[in-house]
Amino acid sequence: MKPIRLYPLVLFIAMSFLSVELTAQARFYPAARSGGSYMHNFYFPPSPSATPWAPDWSPDSEWIAVAMQGSIWKVDPDTGRAYELTYNDAYHSSPDWSPDGKWIIYTADYEHQRIQLEILNLESGESHILTDDQAIYTDPVFSPDGSQVAYVSTNPSGYFNVYVRAISGGKWVGEPIAISRDNEYGSNRLYFGSGDMHITPAWLPDGNELLIVSNRNVPLGSGNVLRVPAVEDGILQATTVLAEQTLYRTRPDVSIDGRRFVYTSTSGS
């Protein structure tokens, strides 16, 4: 009996699996019109793991909120003991503590299709949704007085913009205010596309301004760190405070006195 050559069959099967994999990847976060897999890997929260992620101090400095294994936890920095605060079928990340210590807002990723905002009542231990659609919401952060939340969303057109929305008692009050809007660079940038993005808002202590990262009119990287008023179309009054070929994880954080900010840098790499 002559041996049968399986090489073409193996090649066909391998190519079939590759095709299925690429098709599945193409379906990730369909609401996003920019970024692609590069953004998914370096900007969105990581896949579930045992590694703590996105730490945030409680206002009294007694606890640290972290994302870990798809849930939000609070960690005692003295003992290292962690207590799970949230759990459901979504992947939770990016916790941010309200200034009064009563709430934690966070993101909920549903099977790499959409990312929503949810909020935890620390007194009752119950969470409820703040957004429920097919868009992407990231980087939620309370204003210094707790009356507003800044966040990033792909609503309504699929590009990443910064919004501010009033909140009270764990519920929205009023409509979102667009700090930035869609803007075209004019040509397709490697990894980043032609549509500008505006991400990772951080409040200044007076609650009147934000630092954001944006590649608005920037040819390389995820952009510069901009200082913008926290008002509608504040991006039109933006001032560049750091010009660097940044990456998604720059994530500026402003000091309590408002005189400095820390960030992740590509300088020297």
Set out the residue ranges of the language-model regions.
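Bacterial N-terminal signal peptides
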Residues: 8-19
